[in-house]
């Protein structure tokens, strides 16, 4: 494996679109929205130069921010450790003062009522352990919005039978749009 910082934009885009955790925050277009930030794209390649992991880093005054990144196989703890170790070295080399990471993989799934016992319900403690072993500090599994800069929870609704559950008026409006 090799850590790189000169990823071809097409290779980067192809990789993120195939990744289960791809979000707009790691897309090249996000750097156009955040045009008052600098950015870097880093990654890990195998011996055949195939991307195994990547991240788009937004940079402002020494702060490096990976919104919903890195993108990689979070079941591969060896890869995660390799990425984090090399990201830290790269950040130090480039004089970053802070590296903030909001990983895209949920550490817990469930209803809000059960989140009070989060440490017991974590989907995969290995991810947190990988970050801790690479000297990243975890802000904790807080419950209040005021404790963090980003929202802690994402509301997700399953869309099975979604069209059937819409009100009649909404269904009619959707049909009108389809006819246009």
Task: Walk through the language-model features, giving the residues of each.
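Amphipathic coiled-coil/heptad-repeat helices and related helical stalk/stem segments
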Residues: 26, 83-84, 170
